[in-house]
UniProtKB/Swiss-Prot annotation:
It is found in: Cell membrane. Disruption phenotype: Weak growth, small inflorescences and rosettes, slender stems, and short and retarded primary root growth leading to dwarf plants. Impaired translocation of trans-zeatin (tZ)-type cytokinins (CK) from roots to shoots (acropetal), thereby affecting the plant growth and development and leading to a reduced cytokinin content in xylem sap. Defective in sterol (e.g. 24-methylene cholesterol and sitosterol) composition. Vascular patterning defects in cotyledons and the floral stem, with a stronger phenotype in plant missing also ABCG9 and ABCG11. Altered responses to oxidative stress (e.g. It comes from Arabidopsis thaliana. Its main location: membrane. This is ABC transporter G family member 14. Residues 384-590 form the ABC transmembrane type-2 domain. The gene is ABCG14.
Amino acid sequence: MPQNCIAPRPEEDGGVMVQGLPDMSDTQSKSVLAFPTITSQPGLQMSMYPITLKFEEVVYKVKIEQTSQCMGSWKSKEKTILNGITGMVCPGEFLAMLGPSGSGKTTLLSALGGRLSKTFSGKVMYNGQPFSGCIKRRTGFVAQDDVLYPHLTVWETLFFTALLRLPSSLTRDEKAEHVDRVIAELGLNRCTNSMIGGPLFRGISGGEKKRVSIGQEMLINPSLLLLDEPTSGLDSTTAHRIVTTIKRLASGGRTVVTTIHQPSSRIYHMFDKVVLLSEGSPIYYGAASSAVEYFSSLGFSTSLTVNPADLLLDLANGIPPDTQKETSEQEQKTVKETLVSAYEKNISTKLKAELCNAESHSYEYTKAAAKNLKSEQWCTTWWYQFTVLLQRGVRERRFESFNKLRIFQVISVAFLGGLLWWHTPKSHIQDRTALLFFFSVFWGFYPLYNAVFTFPQEKRMLIKERSSGMYRLSSYFMARNVGDLPLELALPTAFVFIIYWMGGLKPDPTTFILSLLVVLYSVLVAQGLGLAFGALLMNIKQATTLASVTTLVFLIAGGYYVQQIPPFIVWLKYLSYSYYCYKLLLGIQYTDDDYYECSKGVWCRVGDFPAIKSMGLNNLWIDVFVMGVMLVGYRLMAYMALHRVKLR
């Protein structure tokens, strides 16, 4: 009977007592399962609630559409991505998934991390239990791409993560100390105060970014750590450093699973276990040190000293070792079928028997810890999440918000407009109404286009952080809205202040303040529509195209260019917030009983001027109310659209 994983139990005081694991020296060569030795290392935080990960017969299929040759009809066909993957990983163990591109490594990792969007067949168990919120909070998932805010420093990135992911029972100073410990553990002391960097400016190196991503997950002291291609795009020395760090984390009692594409020989020998996939089917599972010997026993031995990983990847591609000439597709297919058949015969049956005999789980949470994990859906309160996200957002966008180019753009347009409408006489009512319409158009469309980019640009970050249960969507949404207000309101305020007085509009402080409030009101409505477009489409190109069409329609139906809209399409103007803004600005500047000099010595009633008569200056509170409905409605639409974003 095979040996089972024996877990370290958490002490009552929160420490970890490492119990001896069974000596596998006598059975290692006979058993498919291999078990690690957990060793405490100085400066390395031990896992408090170790997890045994067991997966059995994991099968995942997707439907792909194909065009039929007859009459161009569409037919759906199933493609198998994963085909019966089985294995087990114990605490302190480092499992690597190897295989060529498209073999299903990332899909399997997503299934193990509870992040597969569609259902799959088979069982994935964590200490004998299915995936749950409790397990999710003990799991760290490091994606292949490092999704980080470019304008935050390394310390700020980890500190804000700690504020959101660590429990509220810890003080702010304690969380900061924890961040310092993680930085020291991962060797990030040299770049603590360096910015992450992005496409437009240089920051820390790729290896340091990867360690920051790992550090974000290490802050919660995960029991299960999953990493997708942690060495992708890194040089061999940096890749070795990263994997050495991961190996140290595993030695602290964590269950570590990683996908890796082409490890060096040094890296390969750090793995405890290996799963080798070929077109979604397993062809090897077991100790990394025994893989070459296993394939040699099948007749796939090499006379050269090669990197074991290179040999395994060649076999997964159907290429036998020591092949001098290029193999045909049929030969590759034959090799793959041989290896899959050998796996079923030599490993699969034995592995399933051992998993059946293994205990369902051998770790138990302390009663208090289990109770807390189950009862608390979130580590922090809504208000706390909102304030932290607001602080982070303001700090991240401090360089972008008051961008010199944007300030120059708005101020230059304001001065140019002021010069064009310089002290417009009261008798030139056509020009004065044109200036008011310019207010409604410019500040109806400028914030709309800026807001369209908001959520598509942050989509990857939103998916990453919400997948890990970092915060509520509502707290993020409110923080994002409030954080954008300083720039969204400061620039139009400066704009109106400049052009209002230069244009010679009604020189009354009350009228000026009311006009400014209407413009700011329109800005918030336009921003809401932009957020809704971005959240609905989550694609910058599509969202800007839709925004362009919408702004054109709103411009034409705004009440200035077309004063007598045909009855069958008159409803269009009631959808345009530019129409309501323009009408409110007219109502603030004029009343129906005001008079202007329509020709020399002749005074005409303002209410009879065609452009104003077609708009009407009555019932302005209805327009205020309609814009209020738009302001709230557009944001609700954006919020509901964000709920539809898939987190997996």
